[in-house]
């Protein structure tokens, strides 16, 4: 197992591409599992088979990378994907997630994303949601989907 923590952060595009090719090659050559820790969704798209999206130390969504990136279920995953700049939106304002991340030493009683979530309901700030299996096969931690999703895992 290779743990790669932000392997391309701060590198120019050519060096990033070289690192990604090296990781792919070693994955294939050695039948190596890679745990990739990154905020770069382009790197996730290039390398990951499965993805876990975390916020404030908790898993918010987990599933096949293609599924999570093309059909995100959790409001944080959706916001994270929307915050990635695209050339097709040139000249438009960049999307930003409102508010500030929580203080990890003083986490709220409920969902730690609820203060920043555009679709939060009162239950979100009151209790931490369970992780549920969605119809897409992803696991999602969100009260808004609990009634439409099978029982908690």
Residue ranges with predicted function:
Residues 3-7, 11-92:
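P-loop NTP-binding/switch modules centered on Walker-like glycine-rich loops
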């Amino acid at each position: 197992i290779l743990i790669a923590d932000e392997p391309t952060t701060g590198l120019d595009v050519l060096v990033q591409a070289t690192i990604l090719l090296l990781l792919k090659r070693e994955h294939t050559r050695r039948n190596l599992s890679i745990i990739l820790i990154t905020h770069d969704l382009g790197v996730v798209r290039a390398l990951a088979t499965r993805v876990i999206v975390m916020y404030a130390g908790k898993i918010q969504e987990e599933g096949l990378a293609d599924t999570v990136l093309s059909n995100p279920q959790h409001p944080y995953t959706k916001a994270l994907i929307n915050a990635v700049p695209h050339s097709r939106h040139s000249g438009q304002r960049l999307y930003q997630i409102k508010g500030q991340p929580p203080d990890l030493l003083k986490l709220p009683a409920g969902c730690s994303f609820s203060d920043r979530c555009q679709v939060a309901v009162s239950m979100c700030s009151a209790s931490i949601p369970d992780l549920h299996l969605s119809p897409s096969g992803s696991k999602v931690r969100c009260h808004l989907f609990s009634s439409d999703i099978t029982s908690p895992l």
